[in-house]
Amino acid sequence: MASLATVAAVKPSAAIKGLGGSSLAGAKLSIKPSRLSFKPKSIRANGVVAKYGDKSVYFDLEDLGNTTGQWDVYGSDAPSPYNPLQSKFFETFAAPFTKRGLLLKFLILGGGSLLTYVSATSTGEVLPIKRGPQEPPKLGPRGKL
């Protein structure tokens, strides 16, 4: 199909043998030039140019905004949307848990105290195999176990 379009673009009044009518008669098919001509576009290979990649310079101290990104987009100078009393509560009581060591100690003490409480309140005979039979066995239909 593409070769047919290129022939039509080159020769406007071309006649192609054997395409129309009977192949035995050899009737000729005339092709009208198409309005949209096929124009191949020249493709040039351009190298990729980085803004800060010239001469192995990837970090520009004069232009830190473009080098590292605009970090002030994420910050906000607006007042806190939370209640001041709520903010004060969490700043006061959550401050000891900001350090990993203090949080780990709290979890160890909490887990140890929970384990101590559960072991002190549980009974030793929880499993039925340790309790044994609670009632005498019932005899079967023939008087046997």
Curated annotation (Swiss-Prot):
Any one Gene Ontology cellular component term annotated for this protein: cytosol
Function: Possible role could be the docking of the LHC I antenna complex to the core complex.
Transit peptide: 1-50
Pfam family, one: PSI_PsaH
Example GO biological process: photosynthesis
Protein name: Photosystem I reaction center subunit VI-1, chloroplastic
Entry keywords, A to Z: Chloroplast, Membrane, Photosynthesis, Photosystem I, Plastid, Thylakoid, Transit peptide, Transmembrane, Transmembrane helix
Membrane topology, as annotated: Single-pass membrane protein
Transmembrane segments: 102-118
Subcellular location: Plastid, Chloroplast thylakoid membrane
Family: Belongs to the psaH family.
Location (main, coarse): plastid
